[in-house]
């Protein structure tokens, strides 16, 4: 338990139906008692937790009523932080909330830092670090599938997997260290070393299995950046509007209408996809259009995937080939548009000979080909993987790097065992693997890492 009491506004700024001041710490009830005047509940602080009390927030210095409020009490350890927690629920205006917060701080609370309530939940053992990070992922989830991935981590799915791996690794370590400390009693036969190496190989395979879903998990968490590119007037903005199901971008018959990158997020088969509608790629003397073309090149460089749109009505031109060359090296989907105007205008096999990626046919204005396009994008990311209630996916780059590091240490430890190297070498690698896995769940995380993680939270969480 930490020794001071913290407070902050726990609801978003601005006007709303309800605004909440959250107080957590050993003096939460004492401080709230100086601010809150209940109606008909004289001993509310001595009552049971998980109850709400009606009354008024007042300034104890002047006796002035600040707001009409409901106060909820959650007693330690059955609270979010495992400390005494009081929440003052008032009206959601900026002024009353700030006045109540100032009074609470004047009565002895300290203003909470970013994520400090969740940090206390971690330090007090209610959450591990994976679950603490998942709290932020739940808040930021943009699709139902993204939410399910975050909730799976919040429920402890990944933590259980990592915990089981660490426990198995600790057992291997204990056996090897016993043979080092007591060589006359615990001399490890070669067959046993092979068995221990097999256990390390199984744990290494567990790391690989989790890492196989890392790219899909990252997309669920951070979104997939898809740059829509092509020469002018091939239907890029029409495609953006069709995928958004709204007229977001201006569409005309005049080439070069789009001068800048337009970014919008859409839900494609559960994936949050950031669509980047770009300026048409062509040689031009127009200064503004040239700036737009430069930004298009930057968008392609920064995108996770490139969607090249071709115009069947104009055939496959040199400009199209230059666009395809620009997208080389990126995950790529080619969409041959306007097949309603020229069904045989572009031979898809000729395009397939130029690119490494799916080539689809579409008539965007008529809505043809959109379902196949969405399925293709999702398929490239998920690779047939189905997410559900019990899916465990690595969605955090920090977790991914730690797992990769743990896998390398496990491989080195296994190699040390089977090659006859001193057992102390294997012990060093096993301990390093344990530290890498512990960084994920927080057992071995240092203050610098915690500061970096919780700095991304809002102050009231």
Swiss-Prot record:
Major site of localization recorded for this protein: cytoplasm
InterPro entries reported in the protein's UniProt record: G_TrmE, GTP-bd, GTP-bd_TrmE_N, GTPase_MnmE, MnmE_dom2, MnmE_helical, P-loop_NTPase, Small_GTP-bd
One Pfam family in the UniProt entry: MnmE_helical
One of the GO BP terms on file: tRNA methylation
Protein residues bound to K(+): 233, 252, 254, 257
Record-listed (6S)-5-formyl-5,6,7,8-tetrahydrofolate binding positions: 22, 87, 126, 461
Residues covered by the TrmE-type G domain: 223-382
Entry annotated with the keyword Membrane: no
Binding sites annotated in the UniProt record for Mg(2+): 237, 258
Cofactor binding notes: Binds 1 potassium ion per subunit.
Keywords tagged on the record: Cytoplasm, GTP-binding, Hydrolase, Magnesium, Metal-binding, Nucleotide-binding, Potassium, tRNA processing
Cofactor names: K(+)
Binding sites annotated in the UniProt record for GTP: 233-238, 252-258, 277-280
A GO cellular component annotation in the UniProt record: cytosol
GO terms of molecular function: GTP binding; GTPase activity; metal ion binding
EC number(s) from the headed UniProt entry: 3.6.-.-
Function comment: Exhibits a very high intrinsic GTPase hydrolysis rate. Involved in the addition of a carboxymethylaminomethyl (cmnm) group at the wobble position (U34) of certain tRNAs, forming tRNA-cmnm(5)s(2)U34.
PANTHER family referenced in this protein's UniProt entry, alphabetically: TRNA MODIFICATION GTPASE GTPBP3, TRNA MODIFICATION GTPASE GTPBP3, MITOCHONDRIAL
Self-association and partners: Homodimer. Heterotetramer of two MnmE and two MnmG subunits.
Protein's recorded name: tRNA modification GTPase MnmE
Organism for this UniProt entry: Desulforudis audaxviator (strain MP104C)
């Amino acid at each position: 338990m930490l020794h001071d009491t913290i407070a902050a506004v726990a609801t978003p700024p601005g006007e709303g139906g309800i605004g909440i001041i959250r107080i957590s710490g050993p003096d939460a009830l004492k401080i709230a008692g100086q601010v809150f005047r209940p109606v008909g509940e004289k001993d509310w602080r001595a009552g049971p937790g998980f109850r709400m009390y009606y009354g008024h927030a007042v300034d104890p210095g002047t006796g002035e009523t600040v707001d009409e409020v409901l106060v909820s009490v959650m007693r330690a350890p059955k609270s979010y932080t495992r400390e005494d927690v009081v929440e003052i629920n008032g009206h959601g205006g900026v002024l009353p909330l700030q006045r109540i917060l100032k009074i609470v701080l004047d009565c002895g609370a300290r203003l909470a830092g970013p994520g400090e309530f969740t940090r206390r939940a971690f330090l007090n053992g209610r959450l591990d670090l994976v679950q603490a990070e998942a709290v932020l992922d739940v808040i930021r989830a943009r699709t139902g599938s993204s939410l399910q991935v975050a909730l799976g981590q919040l429920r402890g799915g990944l933590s259980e997997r990592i915990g089981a791996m660490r426990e198995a690794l600790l057992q291997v370590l204990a056996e090897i260290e016993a043979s080092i400390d007591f060589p006359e009693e615990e001399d490890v036969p070669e067959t046993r070393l092979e068995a221990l190496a097999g256990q390390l190989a199984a744990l290494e395979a567990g790391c690989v299995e989790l890492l196989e879903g890392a790219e899909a998990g990252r997309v669920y968490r951070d979104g997939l950046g898809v740059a829509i590119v092509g020469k002018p007037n091939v239907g890029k903005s029409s495609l953006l509007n069709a995928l958004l199901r709204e007229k977001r971008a201006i569409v005309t018959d005049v080439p070069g209408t789009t001068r800048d990158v337009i970014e919008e997020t859409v839900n494609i088969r559960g994936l949050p996809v950031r669509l980047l509608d770009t300026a048409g790629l062509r040689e031009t003397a127009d200064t503004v259009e040239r700036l737009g073309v430069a930004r298009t090149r930057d968008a392609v460089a920064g995108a996770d995937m490139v969607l090249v749109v071709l115009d069947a009505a104009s055939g496959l031109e040199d400009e199209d080939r230059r666009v395809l060359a620009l997208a080389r090296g990126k995950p790529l989907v080619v969409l041959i548009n306007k097949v309603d105007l020229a069904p045989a205008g572009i031979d898809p096999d000729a395009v397939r000979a130029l690119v490494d990626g799916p080539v689809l046919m579409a008539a965007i204005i008529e809505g043809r080909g959109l379902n196949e396009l969405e399925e293709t994008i999702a398929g490239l990311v998920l690779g047939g993987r189905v997410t559900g209630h019990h899916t465990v996916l690595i969605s955090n780059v920090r977790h991914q790097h730690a797992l990769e590091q743990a896998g390398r240490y496990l491989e080195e430890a296994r190699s040390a065992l089977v090659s006859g190297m001193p057992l102390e070498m294997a012990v060093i690698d096993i301990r390093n693997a344990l530290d890498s896995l512990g960084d994920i769940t927080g057992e071995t995380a240092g203050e610098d890492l915690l500061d970096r993680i919780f700095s991304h939270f809002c102050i009231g969480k």
